């Protein structure tokens, strides 16, 4: 029932044209989309056509997360399907860090791409790259820029306002989410490419044309996956202006002297998490773990998708599947298609 | 209801702030627990992550095509807009200069040519101001130095030769002087190269009979010639006599506007291919064929040259400036600077070299090749030395760019070897397979000419196939030599061997083919 309701809303959202969305969404649809906080609903009413881009970004993040974690025990399912514009992970784990970062990166990526396509009415070309009438300029900026480059700053600002508006508390989990959100969208900005081309007499550089372009989102996911593997454990300490997160330190049991602890801050582009991950073997609502029972695994092979690792030592079931498919189809004049029937059988392994 | 979230400064740690509290209170009252990752997690995440991605071929190709279209879309629009911002002021200033010269020439009876020169100089200055900005002062300083060097012509022919040597040498001096700001030089190099060619041609023209046969042009005429709006930013070289002949425009406006449109359209197409299409295709074929990567990267270099040439042709048409050697004027495009159709489908390397930059070819032929070539009983070795000298001077005009030297000297060897071999083969086989195009049916001195024989003749198809093989070889040489010129020349100092990477990947095949051509020629003759 709840899922049907969500799919109906998604269907209504995607099938409308921008004009209808501009008039209808601001009144009706912004109030009905589940998972939005009041601040996000206000932003939805202010700029309804950006909501479509955010929906695309949401799907970008969801698909990329499920692609990167395919074959892992925690495969990024169930997290994105609960709400339309929300992703909730109860445990402040390493996987939660990746999830928030990829969601923020997807939102920033999609809004920036929508600006470049002209799908959002209030953002246009990056005005800093507009050509001035006089070509003199300052010596620090010798080249004249023109045309539409990807307005990445608008995407950054809008994604930040929208994704950070979900954090209503003022606890350590919120600090962690805000940090990982920023790491995700800043990565998109850093991965922008600037291509330039010189034109002039005999290969000189009398004229120069430059443009910026977004990389494929798969590269963003791959880069975040590297950061996920190097994520840092943090803990909350009380500072002058409230809570702050510092890197956790390994305690040396052999040290007799109690030295003054030196606090380390996490770097801006690092992913951080507060809690150790559960083993994700058993289903647990408290930790958001779906368990690996029923998952397809590989009997021959290594890595996280192998049956020994994926099934947590519980063993696997072997199912012999035999099916008949149509093959070697040929068109006969006139007018029928005839196919042969081929039998194929294989084994499928699932975790107990 | 406004949402609440943390302020900017409290989101992240301020690095300047130092924590003075000695008692770090671990927030035990928080609802989140923290600790070290357990051993099982380390084993799980530290495992072997090598996974085989089963990429479906159809999906992969579709994804690549989508990525191709996306990169094209984000590249074409900025490129065309930026190019139009360059082209439009230049064209308007050329048309303005032409209008002013026309009004002045119709109003009075040409009592003095100084206002015409001033119109050219002023419009050229505005174009250079728009293009290079504050570096215009450096260009004017170099022009003053050039005018002082021009006084050497009082010494006669020897003075012209000294002027040529000093002009080419000063190109290196300029680069060394502004080495600290050498990022400025790639923008000025092309402009100064055309100025140097104009100076040298002016020197040799004025001392053609051995002595200074005419007065040295005055400052206004000199500045109008050097910085004429049609030729100051993008070339090409025109001689001083040709500039004087075209001070008063003669063609009608309708002819010029009719010729402007195809030039501008080809400009836009060429810059689109150079910026967007060729790099995208190079990325597309990046894993399959190294030759295709070389070809598309070299096409990016060539289409950049076509873009500059077509834009310069548009400026010539707008100013009604003709080129030297008026036989190569097209009715649709006006004066031709390059002929892309003969470069993309060359008959031989020497024919594509002549079609690359026709005014520069005219300049080299008139002032370097013809004086060095003796008229009586020219030997093969002497011609080879003269050709190499011509290519060397062409390299020196480009200044301090090692890639230009490598490409042009290699081009000299390849072109001359091919020309010698084909001439020898044509004599042996009595067929029209020389490097130059054979004349028509009556004047062809070989018996196996495509124009003499009929289509069903065997020698016709053999001659055609041989020429086709040489065309394919020239296309390969074009891709091989052109790919080195891709990218900024300032990268030479940083990565010493980076621009030779493509040649190493190809195994220096073009150079070996050139060497084999010479060996085969010596073996036959």
From Swiss-Prot, chain A:
GO terms for biological process: axon extension; canonical Wnt signaling pathway; cell fate commitment; germ-line stem-cell niche homeostasis; muscle organ development; neuron differentiation; open tracheal system development; positive regulation of JNK cascade. The keyword rRNA-binding does not apply. A lipid is attached at residue 202 (O-palmitoleoyl serine). Residues 1-23 form the signal peptide. Keywords: Developmental protein, Disulfide bond, Extracellular matrix, Glycoprotein, Lipoprotein, Secreted, Segmentation polarity protein, Signal, Wnt signaling pathway. One of its GO terms (molecular function) is signaling receptor binding. Palmitoleoylated by porcupine. The lipid group functions as a sorting signal, targeting the ligand to polarized vesicles that transport Wnt2 to unique sites at the cell surface. Depalmitoleoylated by notum, leading to inhibit Wnt signaling pathway. Pfam families: wnt. Dynamic expression pattern during embryogenesis. Expression is predominantly segmented, with expression also seen in the limb primordia and presumptive gonads. In embryonic tracheal cells, expression is close to and dorsal to the tracheal placode. It is found in: Secreted, Extracellular space, Extracellular matrix. Coiled coil: none annotated. Glycans are attached at residues 75, 119. Its main location: secreted. It comes from the Eukaryota. GO terms for cellular component: extracellular region; extracellular space. Disulfide bonds join 65-76, 115-123, 125-148, 196-210, 198-205, 281-312, 297-307, 311-351, 327-342, 329-339, 334-335. Belongs to the Wnt family. Binds as a ligand to a family of frizzled seven-transmembrane receptors and acts through a cascade of genes on the nucleus. Segment polarity protein. May function in gonadogenesis and limb development. Wg and Wnt2 have a role in the developing trachea and together are responsible for all dorsal trunk formation. This is Protein Wnt-2. The lineage of its organism: Eukaryota, Metazoa, Ecdysozoa, Arthropoda, Hexapoda.
From Swiss-Prot, chain B:
One of its GO terms (biological process) is peptide hormone processing. Keywords: Acyltransferase, Endoplasmic reticulum, Membrane, Transferase, Transmembrane, Transmembrane helix, Wnt signaling pathway. The chain crosses the membrane at residues 83-103, 125-145, 159-179, 220-240, 260-280, 301-318, 395-415, 467-487, 505-525. It is a multi-pass membrane protein. InterPro entries: LPLAT_7/PORCN-like (IPR049941), MBOAT_fam (IPR004299). One of its GO terms (cellular component) is endoplasmic reticulum membrane. It comes from the Eukaryota. Its EC number is 2.3.1.250. It is found in: Endoplasmic reticulum membrane. It catalyses: [Wnt protein]-L-serine + (9Z)-hexadecenoyl-CoA = [Wnt protein]-O-(9Z)-hexadecenoyl-L-serine + CoA. Pfam families: MBOAT. The active site is at 398. GO terms for molecular function: acyltransferase activity, transferring groups other than amino-acyl groups; palmitoleoyltransferase activity; Wnt-protein binding. Its main location: endoplasmic reticulum. Interacts with wg and Wnt5. Belongs to the membrane-bound acyltransferase family. Porcupine subfamily. Protein-serine O-palmitoleoyltransferase that acts as a key regulator of the Wnt signaling pathway by mediating the attachment of palmitoleate, a 16-carbon monounsaturated fatty acid (C16:1(9Z)), to Wnt proteins. Serine palmitoleoylation of Wnt proteins is required for efficient binding to frizzled receptors. Also facilitates the glycosylation of Wnt family members, including wg and Wnt5. The cotranslational disulfide bond formation of wg competes with the N-glycosylation. Porc stimulates the post-translational N-glycosylation by anchoring wg at the ER membrane, probably through acylation. This is Protein-serine O-palmitoleoyltransferase porcupine. It comes from Drosophila melanogaster (Fruit fly). The gene is por.
């Amino acid at each position: 029932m709840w899922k049907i309701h969500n799919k109906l809303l998604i269907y209504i959202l995607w099938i409308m044209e921008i004009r209808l969305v501009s008039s209808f969404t601001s009144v009706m649809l912004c109030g009905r989309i589940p998972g939005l906080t009041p601040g996000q609903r206000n932003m939805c009413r202010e700029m309804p056509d950006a909501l479509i881009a955010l929906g695309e970004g949401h799907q970008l993040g969801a698909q990329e997360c499920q692609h990167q974690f395919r074959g892992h025990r925690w495969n990024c399912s169930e997290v994105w399907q609960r709400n339309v514009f929300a992703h909730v992970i109860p445990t402040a784990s390493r996987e939660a860090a990746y999830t928030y970062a990829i969601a923020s990166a997807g939102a920033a990526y999609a809004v920036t791409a929508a600006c470049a396509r002209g799908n959002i009415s209030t953002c246009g070309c990056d005005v800093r790259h507009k050509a001035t009438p006089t070509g003199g300029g300052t010596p620090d900026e010798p080249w004249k820029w023109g045309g539409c480059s990807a307005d990445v700053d608008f995407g950054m600002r809008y994604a930040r306002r929208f994704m950070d508006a979900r954090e209503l508390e003022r606890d350590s989990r919120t600090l962690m989410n805000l940090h990982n959100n920023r790491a995700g969208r800043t990565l998109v900005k850093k991965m922008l490419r600037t291509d330039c081309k010189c034109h002039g007499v005999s290969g000189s550089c009398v004229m120069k044309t430059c443009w910026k372009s977004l990389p494929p989102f798969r590269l963003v996911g791959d880069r975040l996956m590297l950061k996920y593997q190097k994520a840092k454990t943090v803990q909350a300490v009380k500072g002058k202006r409230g809570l702050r997160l510092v890197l956790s330190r390994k305690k040396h049991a052999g040290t007799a002297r109690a030295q003054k602890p030196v606090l380390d801050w996490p770097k801006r582009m690092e992913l951080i998490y507060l809690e150790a991950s559960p083993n994700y073997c058993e289903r647990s609502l408290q930790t958001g773990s779906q368990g690996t029972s029923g998952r397809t695994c590989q009997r021959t092979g290594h890595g996280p998708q192998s049956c020994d690792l994926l099934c947590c030592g519980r063993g696997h079931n072997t199912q012999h599947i035999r099916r008949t498919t149509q093959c070697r189809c040929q068109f006969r004049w006139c007018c029928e298609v005839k196919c042969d029937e081929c039998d194929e059988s294989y084994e499928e392994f699932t975790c107990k | 209801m406004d949402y609440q979230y943390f302020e900017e400064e409290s989101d992240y740690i301020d690095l300047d702030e130092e924590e003075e509290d000695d008692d770090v209170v671990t927030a035990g009252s928080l609802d989140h627990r923290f600790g070290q990752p357990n051993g099982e997690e380390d084993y799980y995440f530290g495992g072997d992550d090598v996974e085989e991605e089963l990429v479906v071929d159809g999906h992969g190709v579709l994804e690549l095509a989508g990525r191709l279209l996306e990169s094209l879309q984000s590249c074409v629009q900025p490129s065309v807009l930026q190019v139009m911002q360059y082209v439009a002021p230049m064209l308007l200033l050329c048309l303005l200069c032409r209008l002013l010269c026309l009004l002045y020439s119709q109003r009075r009876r040409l009592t003095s040519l100084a206002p015409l020169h001033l119109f050219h100089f002023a419009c050229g200055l505005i174009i250079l101001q728009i293009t290079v900005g504050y570096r215009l002062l450096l260009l004017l300083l170099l022009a003053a130095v050039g005018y002082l060097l021009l006084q050497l012509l009082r010494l006669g022919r020897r003075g012209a030769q000294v002027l040529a040597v000093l002009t080419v040498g000063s190109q290196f001096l300029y680069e060394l002087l502004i080495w600290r700001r050498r990022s400025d030089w790639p923008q000025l190099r092309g402009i100064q190269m055309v100025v140097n060619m104009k100076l040298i041609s002016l020197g040799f023209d004025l001392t053609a009979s051995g002595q200074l046969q005419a007065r040295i042009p005055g400052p206004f005429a000199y500045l109008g010639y050097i910085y004429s709006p049609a030729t100051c930013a993008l070339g090409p070289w025109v001689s001083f006599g040709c500039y004087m002949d075209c001070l008063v425009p003669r063609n009608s406006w309708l002819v010029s506007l009719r010729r402007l449109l195809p030039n501008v359209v080809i400009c836009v197409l060429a810059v689109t291919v150079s910026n967007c299409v060729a790099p995208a295709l190079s990325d597309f074929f990046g894993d399959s064929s190294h030759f295709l990567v070389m070809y598309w990267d070299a096409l990016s270099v060539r289409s950049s040259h076509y873009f500059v040439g077509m834009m310069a042709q548009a400026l010539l048409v707008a100013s009604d400036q003709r080129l030297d050697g008026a036989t190569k004027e097209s009715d649709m495009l006006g004066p031709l600077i390059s002929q892309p159709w003969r470069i993309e489908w060359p008959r031989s390397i020497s024919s594509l070299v002549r079609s690359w930059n026709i005014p520069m070819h005219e300049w080299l032929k008139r002032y370097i090749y013809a004086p060095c070539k003796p008229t009586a009983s020219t030997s093969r070795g002497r011609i080879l030395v003269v050709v190499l000298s011509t290519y060397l001077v062409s390299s020196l005009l480009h200044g301090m760019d090692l890639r230009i030297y490598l490409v042009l000297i290699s081009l000299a060897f390849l072109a001359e070897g091919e020309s010698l071999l084909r001439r020898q083969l044509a004599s042996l086989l009595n067929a029209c397979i020389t490097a130059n195009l054979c004349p028509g049916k009556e004047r062809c001195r070989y018996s196996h000419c495509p124009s003499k024989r009929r289509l069903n003749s065997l020698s016709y198809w053999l001659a055609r196939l041989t020429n086709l093989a040489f065309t394919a070889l020239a296309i390969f040489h074009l891709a091989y030599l052109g790919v080195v010129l891709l990218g900024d020349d300032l990268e030479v100092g940083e990565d010493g061997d980076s621009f030779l990477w493509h040649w190493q990947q190809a195994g220096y095949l073009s150079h070996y083919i050139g060497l084999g051509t010479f060996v085969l020629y010596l073996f036959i003759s």
